[in-house]
Amino acid sequence: RAGCVEVDPPGVRFSFVSHMAGLYFHIPFCSHKCGYCNLFSLQTNRADYIATYLETLHKQAQQLSPLTTGLAFDSFAIGGGTPLLLTVSQLEYLLETAALFGVHPSHAFTSIETSPEYADPARLTWLK
């Protein structure tokens, strides 16, 4: 697209036109592969895999965030896999990672993919 720049390290996607931007975090973990899904996903909830992935995503954000100085992120999406497979503390860490780009859900249209399997009271309260 004319005027659009995309940078796609694993797990992070952001694109921007002018000074508005959107940020996408891909969380590839799920309990099972849905028949309609054609996205990269890992059928696991192993804590060590998830922790390593989130730490790596955070390090990438630290490296890339200087490239986005001066941009206003008007959208933020978390997809997967099943992002709500993460614990509430891991979801909080994901928001801390987004904050490195200056993204906060109260200032950007925010969406997160989920499954009824993980829509428990603690996660639903966190989503509010």
Which sequence ranges carry the predicted segments?
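Short amphipathic alpha-helical/adjacent loop interface patches that line ligand
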Residues: 27, 54, 58-61
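Conserved SAM/AdoMet-binding glycine-rich loop
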Residues: 39, 58, 62-128
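N-terminal leader/targeting signatures
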Residues: 10-12
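Aromatic (phenylalanine/tyrosine) cluster motif
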Residues: 14-16
